[in-house]
């Protein structure tokens, strides 16, 4: 049957002999074997290396993307914490300022009250001194009048003159201060 096929092929090929076909077929098989041994395997190795390289690049890109997302999330969390800390600092500063304001106002009120009390005491002391001085003057004038009355007996009109003179002396003494 092989010969018949070769003969038919030979006839169909218009002058190509069966030996040539077998020779070409044998050469083609040898070429395939050589290509498989020397070219196919290195070509497949290169394709496999390229495939591995691309897969590695994809894996690395995915890892970098995940790391970038992780870093982005960390940065967002840090920003959130920073904002919260800043808000807390502002709130603490506001509270501290309010407390200091209240302390300053309370201190100023206490100082004003102290100054007021000191002024009241000073006024009271000066009033007491003025009253004591006035009592001394009244006492000395009373003694003086009594001694003058005793020295001479005065008429009612003389007594009035004496009292008016005494009042005038007191007014002059009070006005001289």
Swiss-Prot record:
GO cellular component: a single term: proton-transporting ATP synthase complex
UniProt entry keywords in alphabetical sequence: ATP synthesis, Cell membrane, CF(0), Hydrogen ion transport, Ion transport, Membrane, Transmembrane, Transmembrane helix, Transport
Source domain of life: Bacteria
Major location category of this protein: membrane
InterPro entries xrefs: ATP_synth_B-like_membr_sf, ATP_synth_b/b'su_bac/chlpt, ATP_synth_F0_bsu_bac, ATP_synthase_B_chain
Cellular localisation: Cell membrane
Pfam families on file: ATP-synt_B
Molecular functions per Gene Ontology: proton-transporting ATP synthase activity, rotational mechanism; proton-transporting ATPase activity, rotational mechanism
UniProt membrane topology term: Single-pass membrane protein
Segments crossing the lipid bilayer: 15-35
Quaternary structure and partners: F-type ATPases have 2 components, F(1) - the catalytic core - and F(0) - the membrane proton channel. F(1) has five subunits: alpha(3), beta(3), gamma(1), delta(1), epsilon(1). F(0) has three main subunits: a(1), b(2) and c(10-14). The alpha and beta chains form an alternating ring which encloses part of the gamma chain. F(1) is attached to F(0) by a central stalk formed by the gamma and epsilon chains, while a peripheral stalk is formed by the delta and b chains.
PANTHER family hit by this protein: ATP SYNTHASE SUBUNIT B, ATP SYNTHASE SUBUNIT B', CHLOROPLASTIC
Family according to the record: Belongs to the ATPase B chain family.
NCBIfam families linked: ATP_synt_b (TIGR01144), PRK13453.1 (NF009987)
Function: F(1)F(0) ATP synthase produces ATP from ADP in the presence of a proton or sodium gradient. F-type ATPases consist of two structural domains, F(1) containing the extramembraneous catalytic core and F(0) containing the membrane proton channel, linked together by a central stalk and a peripheral stalk. During catalysis, ATP synthesis in the catalytic domain of F(1) is coupled via a rotary mechanism of the central stalk subunits to proton translocation. Component of the F(0) channel, it forms part of the peripheral stalk, linking F(1) to F(0).
Protein name: ATP synthase subunit b
Species this chain originates from: Geobacillus kaustophilus (strain HTA426)
Gene encoding the protein: atpF
């Amino acid at each position: 049957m092989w010969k018949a096929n070769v003969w038919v092929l030979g006839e169909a090929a218009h002058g190509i002999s069966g030996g040539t076909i077998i020779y070409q077929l044998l050469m083609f098989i040898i070429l395939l074997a050589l290509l498989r041994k020397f070219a196919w395997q290195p070509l497949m190795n290169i394709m496999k290396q390229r495939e591995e390289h691309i897969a590695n690049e994809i894996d690395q890109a995915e890892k970098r993307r995940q790391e970038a997302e992780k870093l982005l999330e960390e940065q967002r969390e840090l920003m959130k914490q920073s904002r919260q800390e800043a808000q807390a600092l502002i709130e603490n500063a506001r509270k501290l300022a309010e407390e200091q304001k209240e302390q300053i106002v309370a201190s100023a009120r206490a100082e004003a009250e102290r100054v007021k009390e000191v002024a009241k005491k000073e006024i009271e002391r000066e009033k007491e001194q003025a009253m004591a001085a006035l009592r001394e003057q009244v006492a000395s004038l009373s003694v003086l009048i009594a001694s003058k009355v005793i020295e001479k007996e005065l008429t009612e009109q003389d007594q009035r003159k004496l009292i008016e003179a005494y009042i005038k002396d007191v007014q002059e003494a009070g006005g001289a201060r």
